[in-house]
């Protein structure tokens, strides 16, 4: 053959070909593919849209397609068939290894001599495959000419040069984006120090950066807790601070940490490539509170030279890889929830050694420590810090500074309200003052192990549990009438309202109930993922700014620390289980000096025991705490039964639709769970499963099935409800003529001096209806004085 002649010319001995078995499909795919490391893949950067406000871990996101993932022995391997998916520098290095492996797999049963023959035959096949596009017939010579070889090599070099240009351009674009984010605040115009006029903050001796931030936020005067704790914290003393909700506790510990960090930045040597430990670590009980603290500190630190990752949050529900990357940048302030923070520490001991060198540890909402079983992770974190904190570092103190803040520090507040209240005269005489409560101080000292032998105690409001600007009210109703009176309150008193319920099931039922009544309603509870919670809070804030009425239904996950602006009312759909929860719930309104309303919907069973115990513990005046008559310090909301009777049909229909929707979704989830479990166990026939169900489960299922509605029934009820909602409610509906009676409804309609949803009713405010005549006169006198001054 000519082929043998050509091979003899090149000095290759011809060998007789042996019979070779055909390649399988798996072997063909293996011949075409190769295993590549993850770093050698040709990743592409993902462009983030400009309208995306919350990135949620999408910084530096890259993607690739056309790559198979294979797991062998616990190791993840990336299999590539197309060389364009691999960086050019790695193509040539990996080709030889892959071909050798394929040949060994194909010819493992043959002798060594046969392997050599097959490899040579494979080389001939590869040469023929490369020239298939240029094939024009049978030539006398099948050998490749030197000119053709030069053309092939030049084409390969051109392809490589084109591929090399692309990643370089991508790297340049990445560098430009990084530089833009790093220097985005360079053009920020700093206010002149001479223009900052904050005389009330002068005694605290703060830096110009912090004063500029306070001036931009228009914080002209420090609150009582800030004025008393900031100087002590700057001096390095351990502080235990107690103040009512909404009194500015975040800045009381945030400003001292910021001042300490600015001093460290001025002394630090920037040339050293060392990851510095954070100046302060702040622990919060909930994820929402941690994100809120970060946002608040970033606004104060707007004019400081902090980097982009100067203040970071470490919470559950978000990407742990992103949080590890944030900590690797060496942030100055870390705000964390104990669970996720402990998880990161247990993964990396080097991180423990670095974070244990922090200067300040803050515990926000520290009263949770006093409850058994809470914050066990926080105690473990302190133990890790104590073991790994270096002792031989002269610049570092032997112990970190500890700052503790909360609105409630009385252990009596954590007891269940439905239990019998044991009267203790000593405790009643002691009052709610933090300074007199030695038991609480001993518990905190045992768990936190302060640096100072006696931490400094600051009680800004010794006689107040609930803020004085919050008006408390009560609605006495039956257990099944809560929906009716809740809708009555929301209809008559427009504004942003936060409704608290004791169970997640109630939260899930109330949201569709109010939405059926055309009330803009959102819900948040602990079973939602973190992104859903944050998104719900943003939507509620947006709706409350646009609409006159917006409602957020929440479980106790939103009771602590959340600073949602402009909350007019807090409604307790259920009476809270403990007094501390009531204090924190009510503290969501009446913040930053504004007034608010906290209203309870209470059944007769609750008013006889739990409500009485709550009022004894929470009453503002400690001398009057032992009074048995609850109504003396809680005002009853005035009810107009004419309006209640008119809205009752609406509420009944909306409640039926909400119950049907809730029952159908719950039964659907139960059925799906049963079918999935049956498939895993290999059970095909589920007809006999009812025989094995418990009687209680059967009754519960029947109760849900009775509430369920067919599509036609639900459609007819919804049409009937929409018809009722289209008709406007009218005050004194028995009147036959608009112009009859003492009030001229026609004149009110023409002049616009009427309620938005209730015809013939003046536009009212819950605060005005709950105030006494004396309080109304005082307010009128104050408004007149302000007008006269102007």
Swiss-Prot record:
GO CC annotations on file: cytosol; nucleolus
Segments forming domain Helicase C-terminal: 483-642
Motif (Q motif): 199-227
Catalysed reactions listed for this entry: ATP + H2O = ADP + phosphate + H(+)
Enzyme Commission no: 3.6.4.13
Subcellular location: Nucleus, Nucleolus
Pfam families, per the entry: DEAD, Helicase_C
InterPro entries: DEAD/DEAH_box_helicase_dom, DEAD_box_RNA_helicase, Helicase_ATP-bd, Helicase_C-like, P-loop_NTPase, RNA-helicase_DEAD-box_CS, RNA_helicase_DEAD_Q_motif
Keyword Manganese in record: no
All copies of domain Helicase ATP-binding, residue ranges: 230-427
Amino acid composition bias (Basic and acidic residues), ranges on this chain: 80-89
GO molecular function list: ATP binding; ATP hydrolysis activity; RNA binding; RNA helicase activity
Motif (DEAD box): 364-367
Origin superkingdom: Eukaryota
Gene3D superfamilies linked to this entry: P-loop containing nucleotide triphosphate hydrolases
Alphabetized UniProt keyword annotations: ATP-binding, Helicase, Hydrolase, Nucleotide-binding, Nucleus, Ribosome biogenesis, RNA-binding, rRNA processing
Residues the record lists as binding ATP: 243-250
Keyword hit for Ubl conjugation: no
Domain writeup: The Q motif is unique to and characteristic of the DEAD box family of RNA helicases and controls ATP binding and hydrolysis.
Family per similarity comment: Belongs to the DEAD box helicase family. DDX24/MAK5 subfamily.
Role of this protein: ATP-binding RNA helicase involved in the biogenesis of 60S ribosomal subunits and is required for the normal formation of 25S and 5.8S rRNAs.
Entry protein name: ATP-dependent RNA helicase MAK5
The organism's taxonomic lineage, starting at the top: Eukaryota, Fungi, Dikarya, Ascomycota, Saccharomycotina
